[in-house]
Amino acid sequence: MNHGSIHGPGYTGGDGIEAHTSLAGGKKLSDDFHIYAAEWEPDEVRFYLDNQLYATQSRASLKPAQKWAFDHPFFLILNVAVGGDWPGNPDDSTVFPQAMLVDYVRVYAHPGE
């Protein structure tokens, strides 16, 4: 399962704005390389997996106590999470060690920005 999350003031940790998707046919993400993308606009972020849009998160979808993370400096995290409240602690079925292989990361900007 692939998760795309936005964390910011008022929605950190387990309270992030999140969307997720899986591959068709029960295929595992770990079986091959994939293209993950996030397109950022001032008022929304679109998440893609292998060029397929799977979620759009917008400033308008925030709860009143939340602030839009992208009105402030921000950063990208790529990780394999283990333990804690999410996704949960490993058990006897958990295979270690694990690795996340990243072939490349690209950042683009609209012309003139």
Task: Report each predicted region and the residues it spans.
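GH16 jelly-roll
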Residues: 1-113
